[in-house]
Structure formats: structure tokens, C-alpha cells
């Protein structure tokens, strides 16, 4: 549902933050 989608999006944002910090 929508809650699961929100969790997935939050996870993607966390990954992007980590990648940006390493880059």
C-alpha cells in the first residue's frame, strides 16, 4: 500500500544520501 511505498522512498533517499556523501 501507500505506507510501503513511503518506506521504500525513504530507503531510496537514505541510499542517495550515502552515495552522495561518498561521491
From Swiss-Prot:
The keyword Secreted applies. Disulfide bonds: none annotated. Pfam families: Antimicrobial19. Its main location: secreted. Expressed by the skin glands. The keyword Secreted applies. This is Pseudin-4. GO terms for cellular component: extracellular region.
Amino acid at each position: 500500500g501507500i505506507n510501503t511505498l513511503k518506506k521504500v522512498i525513504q530507503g531510496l533517499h537514505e541510499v542517495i544520501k550515502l552515495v552522495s556523501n561518498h561521491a
